């Protein structure tokens, strides 16, 4: 499955300036997803991080990973964000290996590595030009509203 920005807007509860995915290039519901974030100099966070050396904050890279995890789960035809809420319970083993700067295309890959009835653990990677920029494990709980 692939999703354009209009699909993502319908699937996620986020909106500008906190919607951090531009498209999903591959998705197997409840298994994996690959998403793209086009990093531009117009991002509001670059105003202060850092004015003379713009770098995407690591916490926003992790947030982009979390949004890709949400797409992975919400792309299941039985789910939608109006009926379910996903709570992120933990971020573990986060590592930031390469700065992400304006002009970069951030490719985010998420894989479900463990799933129980109402929780999922994801292994997440963010790459720029195939070089690993960051990685983390995210644990999420899925609750019906």
Swiss-Prot record:
SUPFAM superfamilies in the cross-refs: Thioesterase/thiol ester dehydrase-isomerase (SSF54637)
Active site, UniProt feature: 49
Xref: InterPro entries: FabA_FabZ, FabZ, HotDog_dom_sf
Subcellular location: Cytoplasm
Keyword Lipid metabolism listed: yes
Function, in words: Involved in unsaturated fatty acids biosynthesis. Catalyzes the dehydration of short chain beta-hydroxyacyl-ACPs and long chain saturated and unsaturated beta-hydroxyacyl-ACPs.
Source species of the chain: Ehrlichia ruminantium (strain Welgevonden)
KW Lipid biosynthesis (keyword) present: yes
Gene Ontology, cellular component aspect: cytoplasm; membrane
Similarity comment: family membership: Belongs to the thioester dehydratase family. FabZ subfamily.
Catalytic activity, EC: 4.2.1.59
EC main group: lyase
Catalysed reactions, semicolon-separated: a (3R)-hydroxyacyl-[ACP] = a (2E)-enoyl-[ACP] + H2O
UniProt name for this protein: 3-hydroxyacyl-[acyl-carrier-protein] dehydratase FabZ
Secretion signal span: none
Lineage, broadest ranks: Bacteria, Pseudomonadati, Pseudomonadota, Alphaproteobacteria, Rickettsiales
């Amino acid at each position: 499955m692939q999703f354009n920005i209009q699909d993502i807007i319908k699937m996620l509860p986020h909106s500008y300036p906190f919607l951090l995915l531009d498209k999903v290039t591959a998705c197997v519901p409840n298994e994996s997803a690959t998403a793209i974030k086009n990093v531009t100099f117009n991002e509001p966070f670059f105003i202060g991080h850092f004015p003379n050396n713009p770098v995407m904050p690591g916490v926003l890279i992790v947030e982009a990973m979390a949004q890709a995890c949400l797409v992975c789960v919400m792309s299941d035809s039985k789910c939608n964000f109006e009926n379910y809420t996903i709570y992120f319970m933990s971020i573990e083993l986060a590592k930031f290996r390469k700065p992400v700067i304006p002009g970069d295309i951030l490719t985010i890959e998420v894989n479900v590595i463990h799933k129980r009835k109402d929780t999922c653990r994801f292994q997440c990677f963010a790459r720029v030009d195939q070089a690993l920029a960051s990685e983390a494990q995210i644990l999420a709980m899925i609750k019906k509203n």
